[in-house]
């Protein structure tokens, strides 16, 4: 058995869902590896805290949006929200990211997804985020939204926002690779704001308990901004960026597909929006679509009698088509909507964008 075959299997391995002697042995080995990993993380953080490692400015204010754990915490909708908030305030934001998964000269899936939902906002992908920020400034940006920046301490920031998934806030409370924590919860002391994502997925008592746990991890410091957000479908988008109302799904016969960690949840969302699902094809998370996949999907769409093909934005930017088998193809756009602290967080984002650049 491969220890890390895909993100979903890795999560089930670390949370104990995979049982038997093989997974148990793998967990024991991963626990051993997590010890030196923790030492490295601690040493690196101490070096930054004591200024033994240099922190560089990007030339303009920087707003970082990151997380404490591996895997999806709903960070991408927050990045899009921050970029829109800044643009609405008259700023010229650019998004800077590492560009995970992209080959040199190519655009990452995440960058392509953000280009659809926040058109006109430059996106610079660079392993060296300081260089990326400075490149964005040369393209006219007066504020940087740093994607996945919490652990990238080399680039100075004016606001540090951390997203925590309400359904698994602390990654099994174990450091990688035994768990999903990229660094210990005590690192939340660095955060200026914490956003509880997928907040509607848990009850009020659980949300309050997570907030108390965050404050405890910060040594009792409750001064951080606290916000709660949920991921809700807001529109349908095609590959050209065109917007379509969600009402188009109601009573519509659709053929759907998705390559995400929880494809059943996507199907449930479509059903909840009133779609009549004639065919549904799940793929593995992060699936790379080949010509054979697209031909098979087109055949499925045609034979199902669907009037519309629907997928996720994450998949649409990989498929890069306006139709499948002559049937229009659209993606469900998900956005972060705040139930607690949204106005305060927006004000903090705008205020940080007006800081004196370092």
Residue ranges and their predicted role:
Residues 148-150, 313-317:
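Short, polar loop motifs at secondary-structure junctions
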Residues 91, 95-220, 226:
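Phosphate/Mg2+-binding loops and adjacent switch elements
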Residues 65, 96, 164, 229, ...:
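Hydrophobic residues at beta-strand termini and immediately following loops
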Residues 1-18, 169-308, 355-358:
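C-terminal accessory "lid"/substrate-recognition subdomains
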Residues 46-101, 200-201:
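Walker A (P-loop) phosphate-binding motif
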Residues 5-59, 352:
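A transmembrane-helix-recognition feature enriched in membrane-embedded lipid enzymes
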Residues 232-234, 284-288, 326-357:
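Short, flexible loop segments at boundaries between secondary-structure elements
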């Amino acid at each position: 058995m491969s220890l890390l075959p895909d993100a979903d299997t890795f999560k089930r391995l670390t949370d104990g869902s995979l049982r038997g002697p093989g997974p148990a042995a793998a967990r024991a080995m991963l626990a051993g590896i997590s010890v030196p990993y923790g030492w490295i993380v601690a040493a690196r953080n101490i070096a930054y805290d004591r200024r033994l490692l240099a922190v560089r400015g990007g030339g303009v204010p920087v707003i970082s949006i990151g997380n404490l754990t591996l895997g999806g915490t709903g960070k991408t909708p927050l990045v899009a929200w921050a970029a829109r908030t800044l643009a609405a305030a008259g700023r010229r934001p650019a998004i800077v990211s590492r560009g995970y998964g992209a080959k040199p000269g190519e655009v990452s899936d995440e960058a392509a997804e953000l280009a659809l939902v926040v058109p006109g906002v430059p996106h610079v992908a660079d392993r060296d985020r300081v260089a990326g920020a400075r490149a964005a400034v040369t393209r006219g940006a007066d504020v940087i939204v740093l994607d996945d920046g919490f652990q990238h301490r080399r680039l100075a920031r004016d606001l540090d926002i951390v997203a925590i998934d309400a359904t698994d806030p602390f990654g099994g409370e174990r450091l990688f690779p035994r768990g999903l924590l990229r660094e210990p919860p005590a690192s939340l002391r660095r955060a200026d704001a914490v956003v509880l994502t997928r907040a509607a997925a848990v009850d009020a008592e659980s949300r309050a308990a997570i907030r108390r746990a965050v404050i405890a991890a910060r040594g009792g410091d409750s001064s951080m901004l606290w916000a709660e957000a949920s991921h809700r479908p807001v529109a349908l988008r095609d590959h050209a960026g065109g917007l379509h109302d969600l009402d188009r799904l109601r009573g519509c016969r659709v053929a759907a597909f998705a390559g995400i960690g929880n494809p059943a949840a996507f199907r449930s969302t479509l059903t909840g929006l009133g779609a009549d699902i004639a065919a549904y094809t799940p793929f593995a998370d992060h699936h790379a679509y080949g010509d054979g996949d697209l031909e098979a999907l087109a055949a499925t769409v045609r034979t199902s009698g669907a009037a519309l093909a629907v997928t996720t934005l994450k998949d649409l930017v990989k498929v890069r088509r306006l139709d499948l088998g002559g049937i229009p193809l659209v993606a469900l756009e998900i956005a972060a909507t705040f139930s607690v602290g949204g106005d305060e967080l927006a004000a903090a984002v705008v205020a940080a964008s007006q800081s004196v650049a370092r």
